[in-house]
Amino acid sequence: MAHPRVFFDMSADGQPVGRIVMELRSDVVPKTAENFRALCTGEKGFGYKGSRFHRVIPNFMCQGGDFTNHNGTGGKSIYGTKFEDENFQLKHTGPGILWMANAGPNTNGSQFFITTAKTSWLDNRHVVFGSVVEGMDVVKKLESLGSQSGKTNKKIAVVDCGQI
């Protein structure tokens, strides 16, 4: 079975930036991949459409997925508020890796990161569940809107999203 592919159509201050296509590793982390896929489609009545990338640090990552508070303090999974770390088989090997944000072990919700560099120090601490397969140029454009504090100089938003 092919790995599910999902997309984000991104904007900065209301101007289109482009599409990011991500492949989800449902073969290794099925529960984590399904959470992200369903949040992309919005099929549970909530999800990423209209949400923001609230934190972007150049040469590290872009963070999004807080569709409830829009500032990094909220979000929820399709399983309730938080769910367990499925496994740590996949690693943070370089730019374009998708991984779950957490507040410690077994606290996965909807927030996620896209790496813009190798981040191997996060192995065995954050669940990797996929990677960018198209639109890494869009990720780099978004990265350029960040700062060392993580504050973005434009409002970065997911205008549309879904499964391909």
From Swiss-Prot:
GO terms for molecular function: cyclosporin A binding; peptidyl-prolyl cis-trans isomerase activity. GO terms for cellular component: cytoplasm. It is found in: Cytoplasm. Residues 7-163 form the PPIase cyclophilin-type domain. Its EC number is 5.2.1.8. Keywords: Cytoplasm, Isomerase, Rotamase. Binds cyclosporin A (CsA). CsA mediates some of its effects via an inhibitory action on PPIase. Its main location: cytoplasm. The keyword Cytoplasm applies. It holds the Pfam family Pro_isomerase. One of its GO terms (biological process) is protein folding. Ubiquitous. It catalyses: [protein]-peptidylproline (omega=180) = [protein]-peptidylproline (omega=0). PPIases accelerate the folding of proteins. It catalyzes the cis-trans isomerization of proline imidic peptide bonds in oligopeptides. Belongs to the cyclophilin-type PPIase family. PPIase A subfamily. This is Peptidyl-prolyl cis-trans isomerase. It comes from Blattella germanica. The lineage of its organism: Eukaryota, Metazoa, Ecdysozoa, Arthropoda, Hexapoda.
